[in-house]
C-alpha cells in the first residue's frame, strides 16, 4: 500500500521525507501537527532560511484528519493519534487515496518551481547520553582506600574484601615483599595512616561502621577504615549463598599475625570460616547491641585505632584457633540470634567454654594490647606498611 507514496517520495527532488515527517503512518505527527509546511513555528523562526520538503499524500490527508481527531479526543497523545491515522490510511482504498496523491504531486511540482536547486540535507539527531553516576557515592566514600577492596565494593561483590584479597593473592603471589600487608590483604597503601588526623578519621569511620553494620567480620567489620559503606547487615544472615572459599582466604589474611604465625594460610583456611567469624562476630554484635557488659571493648578498640593507626580493630577480630577445628556444619543455614551462644561455646577453646561472652571479651582485649605494640615496633616498612619479617 505504500507503493504510491514511495513513488511520490522517490520522484521528489529531495528523496524521502524529513526525519520528523516520515512517509507512512510513522510520520503522521510530523507535518500535520502544525498545519503542513508551516508546522513547527519555533523551528521556523530559528531557521528561517531552511526550506521544508513537500508533503506526500499521507501528510496531505493526515493534516486535516489529525486536527479533527485532536478536537474529538483532546486528551489523546499525539503519538496515539499518529498510530490511529496510520492504521486508517492503510485500510483506505486507492480511489480514496487518489485526490491526496494528486495534491501531493501538485505540491511537489510547486516546490521544484520555487526551489530549483533544492537538495535534501537530513538533520542529525543528537543521541541522549546515559548518565553513568551509579557508583558516584561509593566511589566518593572509597577514594582514600583505592585498592582492591574499593573495586570490590564498587562492583557489588557480595563478599567484599574477601574477593579482593583472593584476587590480590592470585594475581601477585610474590608481591608481598615489595608492598607489605597493603597488597597481600587487598588494602591500599594508605590504609594504615601514619598521621594523627588520619588515625582519628579511621577511628571515626570504624565507630560508624560498628553502629551501622553490626561488625561484619568477613566483609565490613574487619576493615572498617577501608569500607565504611559496605552494605552488609549481620554475618549469620548476610550470606545465604555460602561463599566459603572467599572467607577462608580472608580469615587466612586475618590470622597472618605474630600471634599465630605458626599457622600459615593452609592451616588457617580449613578452620577460618567455621571457627573464626562466630567467636568474634557474636562478641562484637553483643557489644554493639548492648547484650552484656562488653561495651568497654569497643571503646578500647576505638582508642587503639586512634593511637596505632586503626590496627586495634584488626586485633579485636583476630581469633586464633587450633588448626584441627572442623568447619561449621551449621553455616549452610542462616542461624537465629538465639543460637549464637551455642555457636560461641562450640567454637571457643576448651578453657573458655564456661562463659562465652566473657571469654570472647578477654581474648579480644588481650589481642588489643599485643597487636598494636608489635606493629608500632615493626612499622618501618614501605609507605607505612608492615614488612612480613615474621614469616
Swiss-Prot record:
Pfam family, one: SOXp
Tissue distribution: Mainly expressed in the developing central nervous system.
Motif (9aaTAD): 342-350
Main location: nucleus
Record keywords, A-Z: Activator, DNA-binding, Nucleus, Transcription, Transcription regulation
Subcellular location: Nucleus
Gene Ontology terms, MF aspect: DNA binding; DNA-binding transcription activator activity, RNA polymerase II-specific; DNA-binding transcription factor activity; DNA-binding transcription factor activity, RNA polymerase II-specific; RNA polymerase II cis-regulatory region sequence-specific DNA binding
Region (Disordered): 1-52, 214-249
InterPro entries linked: HMG_box_dom, HMG_box_dom_sf, SOX_fam, SRY-related_HMG-box_TF-like
Biased composition (Basic residues): 224-240
GO biological process: brain development; cellular response to leukemia inhibitory factor; chromatin organization; forebrain neuron development; interneuron migration; lens morphogenesis in camera-type eye; negative regulation of transcription by RNA polymerase II; neuron differentiation
GO CC annotations on file: chromatin; nucleus
Composition bias, Gly residues: 26-44
Domain notes: The 9aaTAD motif is a transactivation domain present in a large number of yeast and animal transcription factors.
Stored PANTHER family: SOX TRANSCRIPTION FACTOR, TRANSCRIPTION FACTOR SOX-1
Function: Transcriptional activator. May function as a switch in neuronal development. Keeps neural cells undifferentiated by counteracting the activity of proneural proteins and suppresses neuronal differentiation.
Name the UniProt record assigns to this protein: Transcription factor SOX-1
Name of the gene: SOX1
Amino acid at each position: 500500500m505504500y507503493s504510491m507514496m514511495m513513488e511520490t517520495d522517490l520522484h521528489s527532488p529531495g528523496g524521502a521525507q524529513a526525519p520528523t515527517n516520515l512517509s507512512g503512518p510513522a510520520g503522521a505527527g510530523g507535518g500535520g501537527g502544525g498545519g503542513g509546511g508551516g508546522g513547527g513555528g519555533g523551528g521556523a523562526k530559528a531557521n528561517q532560511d531552511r526550506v521544508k520538503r513537500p508533503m506526500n499524500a499521507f501528510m496531505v490527508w493526515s493534516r486535516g484528519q489529525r486536527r479533527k481527531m485532536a478536537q474529538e479526543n483532546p486528551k489523546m497523545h499525539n503519538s496515539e493519534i499518529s498510530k490511529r491515522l496510520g492504521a486508517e490510511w492503510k485500510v483506505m482504498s486507492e480511489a480514496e487515496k487518489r485526490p491526496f496523491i494528486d495534491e501531493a504531486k501538485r505540491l511537489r511540482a510547486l516546490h521544484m518551481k520555487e526551489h530549483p536547486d533544492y537538495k535534501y540535507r537530513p538533520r542529525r539527531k543528537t543521541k541522549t547520553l546515559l548518565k553513568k553516576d551509579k557508583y558516584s557515592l561509593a566511589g566518593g566514600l572509597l577514594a582514600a582506600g583505592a585498592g582492591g577492596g574499593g573495586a570490590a565494593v564498587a562492583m557489588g561483590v557480595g563478599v567484599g574484601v574477601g574477593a579482593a584479597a583472593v584476587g590480590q593473592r592470585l594475581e601477585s603471589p610474590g608481591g608481598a615483599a615489595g608492598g607489605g600487608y597493603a597488597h597481600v590483604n587487598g588494602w591500599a597503601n594508605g590504609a594504615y595512616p601514619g598521621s594523627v588526623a588520619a588515625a582519628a578519621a579511621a577511628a571515626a569511620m570504624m565507630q560508624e561502621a560498628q553502629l551501622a553494620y553490626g561488625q561484619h567480620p568477613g566483609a565490613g567489620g574487619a576493615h572498617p577504615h577501608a569500607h565504611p559503606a559496605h552494605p552488609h547487615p549481620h554475618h549469620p544472615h548476610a550470606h545465604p549463598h555460602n561463599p566459603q572459599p572467599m572467607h577462608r582466604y580472608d580469615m587466612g589474611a586475618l590470622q597472618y599475625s605474630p600471634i599465630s604465625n605458626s599457622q600459615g594460610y593452609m592451616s588457617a583456611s580449613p578452620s577460618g570460616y567455621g571457627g573464626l567469624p562466630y567467636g568474634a562476630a557474636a562478641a562484637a554484635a553483643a557489644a554493639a547491641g548492648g547484650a552484656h557488659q562488653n561495651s568497654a571493648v569497643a571503646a578500647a578498640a576505638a582508642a587503639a585505632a586512634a593511637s596505632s593507626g586503626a590496627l586495634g580493630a584488626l586485633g579485636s577480630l583476630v581469633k586464633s584457633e587450633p588448626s584441627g577445628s572442623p568447619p561449621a556444619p551449621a553455616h549452610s543455614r542462616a542461624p537465629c540470634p538465639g543460637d549464637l551462644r551455642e555457636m560461641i561455646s562450640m567454637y571457643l577453646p576448651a578453657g573458655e567454654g564456661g562463659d562465652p561472652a566473657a571469654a570472647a571479651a578477654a581474648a579480644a582485649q588481650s589481642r588489643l594490647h599485643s597487636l598494636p605494640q608489635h606493629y608500632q615496633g615493626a612499622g618501618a616498612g614501605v609507605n607505612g606498611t608492615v614488612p612480613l619479617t615474621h614469616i
